[in-house]
UniProtKB/Swiss-Prot annotation:
<feature type="transmembrane region" description="Helical">
    <location>
        <begin position="7"/>
        <end position="27"/>
    </location>
</feature>
<keyword id="KW-0812">Transmembrane</keyword>
<keyword id="KW-0375">Hydrogen ion transport</keyword>
<dbReference type="InterPro" id="IPR038662">
    <property type="entry name" value="ATP_synth_F0_csu_sf"/>
</dbReference>
<dbReference type="GO" id="GO:0008289">
    <property type="term" value="F:lipid binding"/>
</dbReference>
<comment type="function">
    <text>Key component of the F(0) channel; it plays a direct role in translocation across the membrane. A homomeric c-ring of between 10-14 subunits forms the central stalk rotor element with the F(1) delta and epsilon subunits.</text>
</comment>
<keyword id="KW-0793">Thylakoid</keyword>
<dbReference type="InterPro" id="IPR035921">
    <property type="entry name" value="F/V-ATP_Csub_sf"/>
</dbReference>
<protein>
    <recommendedName>
        <fullName>ATP synthase subunit c</fullName>
    </recommendedName>
</protein>
<keyword id="KW-0446">Lipid-binding</keyword>
<dbReference type="GO" id="GO:0033177">
    <property type="term" value="C:proton-transporting two-sector ATPase complex, proton-transporting domain"/>
</dbReference>
<dbReference type="InterPro" id="IPR000454">
    <property type="entry name" value="ATP_synth_F0_csu"/>
</dbReference>
<keyword id="KW-0406">Ion transport</keyword>
<dbReference type="InterPro" id="IPR020537">
    <property type="entry name" value="ATP_synth_F0_csu_DDCD_BS"/>
</dbReference>
<keyword id="KW-0066">ATP synthesis</keyword>
<dbReference type="GO" id="GO:0045259">
    <property type="term" value="C:proton-transporting ATP synthase complex"/>
</dbReference>
<keyword id="KW-0813">Transport</keyword>
Length: 81
């Protein structure tokens, strides 16, 4: 792999992780804020709200993990060889 392709892979890997973390990070903050607000309004529903929140946070975090997998493939699997 030549140096330009190697440099482009490193830049693309950085962008993949960075951009894949922005959306879920904003979504997780919004969801957590909504959950805290919902628990403050209705404390007796805390268990149900917490369970739903944790499930949705796991789904959001999976998007970030997909970005990490793409970055690792770009760095170590050498798809351009």
């Amino acid at each position: 792999m030549d140096s330009i392709t190697s440099a482009a892979s490193v830049v693309a890997a950085g962008l993949a992780v960075g951009l894949a973390a922005i959306g879920p990070g904003i979504g997780q903050g919004t969801a957590s804020g909504g959950a805290v607000e919902g628990i403050a309004r209705q404390p007796e529903a805390e268990g149900k709200i917490r369970g739903t929140l944790l499930l949705s946070l796991a789904f959001m975090e999976s998007l970030t993990i997909y970005g990490l997998v793409v970055a690792l493939v770009l760095l170590f699997a050498n798809p351009f060889a």
